[in-house]
Amino acid sequence: MLPWKHALRTLSVLLLTAAATLAPTASAQAAAAPSRGWNDFSCKPSASHPRPVVLVHGTFGNSVDNWLALAPYLVNRGYCVFSLDYGQLPNVPFFHGLGPIEKSAEQLDVYVDKVLAATGAAEADLVGHSQGGMMPRHYIKFLGGAEKVNALVGIAPDNHGTTLLGLTKLLPYFPGVEKFISANTPGLADQIAGSPFITRLNEGGDTVPGVTYTVITTKYDEVVTPYRSGFLDGPNVTNIVIQDKCALDLSEHVAIGTLDRITFHEVTNALDPVRATPTTCASVIG
């Protein structure tokens, strides 16, 4: 094999492998099972938690696997919780978030309307992991979501794209790779730092008035790099590094969104700031 072809294949594998780490570690078979305790469209928000919470999975995720820990955590605290699948590709079961992100935002638009109609609420709160923390910003900014969303909580979101530890900067040196990614997994191409999608998303400001934004990151993120690129700039933004709450928290990109109860506690603080309590290492047992 010619050296450049070997390098091309290696880079392709590295890119897809790095992107695959966005997937939760739970078995994909769980996606075939119904969610328990959430996605209950008979749930009516309470006076203490008047808005339904919509969970938005990350790349290679789905509406069940991504939320096997966080959804019950929120349900047990009195929230009406819902989750959707989006960004599906033909003949690719379980692993979603791979389609064009603009189309995924349209799917979110339809789903939020469905949740609001079922619950009778005027607004929803959105909590997303990785792409799921970034994609709703397109919905809020361009599809009228600002009128329907009170708060967006992004867990390790790639709000300004990612370099995948610098790998994406090598794409111009390998003819065909970028075209291959765009054609086969447009949702990945959209997340590359400097992509047309990311550029348009952030033009004119990161945020929209009337929506509260919270970003929770980890300094051990190996997918959204640099990790502070997930931060947003705006008067209605709280940017958090989870290690500032607990220096012992070693969560990386996947764990922070799927397993980390310290992060979960910070999510509830963002959803209900009036009743917020300090997040510490002890929050893991809260």
Give residue ranges: language-model regions.
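Secretory targeting and sorting signals
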Residues: M1-A30
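Composition-driven, intrinsically disordered low-complexity tracts enriched in small residues
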Residues: A28-A47, A117, H160, L165-T185, ...
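Short, surface-exposed "cap/lid" segments of acyl-processing enzymes
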Residues: F41-P90
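Extracytoplasmic/secreted proteins, especially bacterial periplasmic and envelope-associated proteins
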Residues: R51, L55, D65, A69, ...
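Serine-dependent carboxylesterase/thioesterase catalytic core
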Residues: V56-H57, V81-L84, E102-N202
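Second-shell loop/turn segments in exported
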Residues: G58-G61, P93-G99, P186-L188, S251-G257
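Glycine-rich "HGGG/HGxG" loop immediately N-terminal to the catalytic nucleophile
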Residues: D85-L98, T163
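C-terminal catalytic-base region of ester-bond hydrolases, centering on the histidine
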Residues: F174, T207-G286
